Design a protein with these regions (language model features):
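Flexible internal linker/loop segments at domain or repeat junctions
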Residues: 492-510
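Short acidic-glycine motifs
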Residues: 1-480, 484-487, 505, 509, ...
């Protein structure tokens, strides 16, 4: 009998950080004296004085799920001109689960021992003997199709179907079930630990850690770190998309077919992590405590440390014993003040999508060596909560519906292949030029939308939610036409900061995430290829092919900076007003609408690759 023990451990990385504080004079307290700071981090390292760090418990975590599907379909030729297709598919998909139920989530009503018994503790499927989410058992997807020959050269086609996506994959790392035990120095100049003394036993957390007080860090509860996963109760519901189309197919002339169709779909239950914030301050919570976000005095109170006199009537009114006095009043009033995060939901199927399009396609079937396809799409794509960074106010959910960040209303694509025929009576010349294949794919379309800039009014310090700048009506969004091919990025900014205004302190912005007329430069994609197969005998052939990208060598500049309309314009001569005069500015180096010319082109210059392959 032979054997060998195998043990695979994950999450074994940790952190020891060293600071100047441990080798500085205590009275200095990080002050700058004579232009220099006191203390030296490398000296702290040599002495083994650790300022802060993290100990990750080793873990052996495994998440998985199950999926089955059944389908049936049939085609019924009702008459010589009418064909009817029908079918149904059933999907059953579970949500990801840790094999032994060690993945944590939040129990809103359970007392948290680390937070003095305040509601909001951690539970595990292995300890609650429950399932975090429900599995959707009704994912039936019918499919219907119809084709009717109106005339010998004209066919009407229509279709309808319901399709289901899979549930989420296991988007959790080992740290989700084995949180890092972060530690910090108890005071200025004092080490959190020494390398000579090793890691203190109280810094070590067991694995698995199934404590209801696993968050915040039991050894350092003032860090207010929250759980990394809040499993949504509907995590077992797959996304659903309802699709339909109707169109006409017509043979215009011999070997040329035209297709025109309306194609649409509606999606629901797509994964979203941005439509909920379980730990934000709402108007109802503020009203309960007699606070008004529109009152400047109340805003000052919310931003004040709860242990300071600026907190007013909230001074030292701690939500639980041990709550840090340096935390703000706003933090203390959160639904779960023991956590500083928004408690993002995991696998929440709340996103929605909309798509409507007119699609036309012309197909030149193979004849005389030529195959040609031209496709044109005129579409509108909208989404709600599916794409990151696109929610302005989750409490007014439908206000966040906007065009998709991948929206391209107009797209044209040409693809063609042509095989050169025999040329002339000269056999040698004909043999050289014949059978070469020339292919191309040319794609043209609208530019992608630019995300509205995020406000800098610090609303997140009050309500723990961000917002957007306001769009100023009637003010042009651009200073230069992004598609004119006439921009000098060293001298010109392309976006207009005056088109945006910052909401007032404590106010929500009114802008949508995306606007149809606020887009980046159009990005053509043009490629071409040349090739031929030389056959020597039946079993031997040489393939020669040359592929070109950006065949017309177009210059495409980088996308402009569009994050902060209040950002100062900078140039080699300085910043601010001096940069507005091209005669004195030198070269631009930053600002709202700045195109970073130092980063090179958005698309590489024309390049080609030669491929040769010999088969035998």
């Amino acid at each position: 009998e032979f054997g060998y023990p195998v043990q695979a451990l994950a999450n074994t990385n940790g952190l020891f950080a060293f600071s100047a504080n441990q080798t500085a004079q205590p009275y200095a307290q990080s002050s700058i004296i004579g232009g220099r700071t006191v203390g030296f981090p490398y000296a702290s390292f040599l002495l083994g004085l650790v300022d802060h760090g993290a100990i990750n418990p080793v873990a052996d975590l495994r998440t998985g799920k199950h999926f089955i599907a059944l389908f049936a379909q049939d085609s019924w030729k009702v008459t010589r001109k009418l064909t009817f297709d029908y079918g149904v598919r059933y999907d059953y998909d579970t949500y990801p689960r840790e094999q032994y139920g060690r993945l944590p989530t939040l129990a809103p009503g359970l007392a948290n021992p680390t937070a003095g018994g305040h509601p909001g503790a951690i539970i595990y499927e292995s300890t609650c003997n429950c399932s975090f989410a429900k599995i959707y058992p009704y994912a039936f997807g019918p499919r219907l199709g119809l084709a009717y020959q109106i005339t010998p050269k004209t066919v009407f086609r229509a279709g309808f179907g319901v399709a289901y996506d899979g549930t989420a994959t296991a988007q959790t790392g080992t740290a989700s079930a084995a949180p890092a035990n972060n530690f910090a120095a108890p005071g200025f100049g004092d080490p959190a630990m020494t390398l000579a003394g090793g890691v203190p036993s109280n810094y070590l957390l067991p694995w698995p850690n199934l404590s209801p007080g696993a968050y915040p860090n039991p050894n350092f509860p003032t860090t207010l770190n929250g759980p990394t996963s809040i499993v949504d109760q509907n995590a077992g519901r797959p996304a659903r998309q309802t699709q339909w189309s109707a169109g006409i197919q017509r043979e215009i002339v011999s070997n040329v077919v035209l297709d025109v169709a309306y194609v649409g779909n509606r999606g629901a239950w797509w994964l979203s992590s941005i439509l909920d914030n379980y730990n934000a301050l709402t108007p109802q919570i503020l009203a309960h405590y007699g606070l008004d976000i529109n009152n400047p005095n109340d805003r000052a109170t919310l931003r004040a440390p709860i242990g300071s006199t600026a907190a007013g009537r909230f001074q030292n009114q701690l939500p639980y014993a041990g709550f840090p006095l340096t935390a703000t009043v706003a933090q203390a009033l959160r639904p779960f003040p023991q956590f500083s995060s928004g408690l993002t939901p995991l696998w929440a199927p709340e996103g929605r999508t909309w798509y409507d399009s007119l699609q036309a396609k012309v197909t030149k079937r193979y004849s005389h060596g030529l195959i040609l396809d031209y496709a044109f799409t005129w579409a509108r794509e909208e989404q709600l909560g599916v794409e990151a960074g696109t929610v302005n106010d989750y409490q007014n959910r439908m206000q966040n519906k906007s065009i998709s960040g991948f929206s391209r209303p107009i797209v044209s694509v040409v693809s063609a292949n042509y095989v050169l025929p025999k040329w002339g009576p000269n056999k040698i010349f004909s043999e050289i030029v014949r059978d070469w294949t020339i292919g191309t794919v040319l794609s043209y379309g609208s530019g992608l939308p630019i995300l509205s800039p995020a406000s800098t009014n610090n609303l997140s310090t009050l309500l723990f939610r961000p917002t957007f700048f306001n769009r100023v009506p009637g003010v042009p969004l651009y200073l230069q036409n992004l598609n004119c091919h006439c921009i000098d990025p060293t001298k010109q900014l392309v976006l207009n900061p005056a088109a945006w205004s910052n909401p007032g302190d404590g106010q929500w912005g009114t802008a949508a995430p995306y606007y149809n007329n606020f887009r980046y430069e159009r990005r053509p994609a043009e490629s071409m290829s040349f090739g031929r197969v030389f056959r020597f005998r039946e079993s031997m052939a040489l393939t020669v092919r040359m592929n070109f990208q950006n065949i017309f060598n177009r210059t495409q500049l980088q996308n402009p900076s569009a994050t902060n309309p209040l950002a100062p314009t900078t140039c080699t001569a300085g910043s601010g007003a001096v940069c507005t005069n091209p005669a004195t500015a030198g070269l631009l180096t930053g600002g709202f609408g700045f195109v970073n010319y130092l980063a090179g082109d958005f698309v590489s210059p024309r390049q080609g690759t030669l491929e040769m392959r010999f088969q035998f």
